Amino acid sequence: MPKAVAVILVNWNTPAFTANCIRSLIEYCDNLLFDIIVVDNGSTDGSLSTLSTEFPELIYIDNQENLGFAEGNNKGLQHSIDAGYEYSLVINTDTLVDEDIVSGLMTHLNNYPKAAAVQPAIFWMHNRTKLWNGPCGFNALLGITYSKTQDNIQELISYQNVEWVTGCCILIRNSTLKTAGLFNKQFFLYYEDVELSYRLRSHGYEVHYLPTSKMYHEAGISGKSSTKSAEGFLNPFIHYYTSRNHIWFLRKYGKPVFYPLNWIYNAGYYLAVLAYLKLRGRNKKVSLLLKGIKEGLFTPQTLIWPNN
């Protein structure tokens, strides 16, 4: 019989961060509860060799190419389901824990059978008293997603039934994935967690935020550079994926009665971003943002996800 939880880490050229995350999980969490699956997304820096040398006991999946966050995690999730694990913990590699979040999150799902998934409170790595991600929601009027990070949110002591949970760290009940499907690989990167949350909820499940479990996040390590280029620190492709996937999400899950205001508000937002990028000379970002908007509006959504 497998252990209860498969912990899934998707690595892409970040072996040092991944190793630190693994060490913290091994140190603080009950090792009898989980196995760790490292999915390497076509790293070019020898990540797989580095990690497997230090942690030979882990399970490794070599994707050979960068399949994106969504499909990279799907490879680990499919292995978890096929191997008979009850739960899967999807967790970013640039995170650390200093408590047993595996048992905390698992106990919560055991106590709430209607919940398909649960996330902990996530704090900034560099400021461990400041919340990076709290209860997540969707403003249907404006057509934007959000996460509550105000100081008073930290005072929550009971779980919240929320609209979506972040892919930074989610414990998911595998049986619900068999019903609703895995991440939508068409999204590749960004909004795949929001879309899956809404799909799980459309099947009658709940998704929860558990403030009594916590972890720490570096945030966006694979999407930013340590040195500033003509395009700044942020990878230009982030503008492409976030704009395209945001619009796809609105087309699928937005409320038609609010569409006029959604499009007016977001058109204004994207025009402001385009103007800012143009003034800063970030021409590649301008081009990719326009491409993302165009594809979001006009590319058919195939809504591909594996079903078991």
Annotate the PLM regions.
Residues 255-308:
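Non-catalytic, C-terminal membrane-associated alpha-helical segments of glycosyltransferases
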Residues 85-96:
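Short beta-strand-to-loop acidic/aromatic patch adjacent to the donor-nucleotide binding site
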Residues 23-33:
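Short, acidic, metal-binding catalytic loop of nucleotide-sugar glycosyltransferases
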Residues 163-172, 176-182, 186-216:
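A short, conserved alpha-helix in the catalytic core of glycosyltransferases
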Residues 62-83:
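Glycine-rich, basic loop-to-helix element that forms the pyrophosphate-binding segment
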Residues 138-163:
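Short, flexible, basic/aromatic active-site loop/helix in glycosyltransferases
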Residues 96-132, 138:
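Conserved donor NDP-sugar-binding/catalytic core segment of glycosyltransferases
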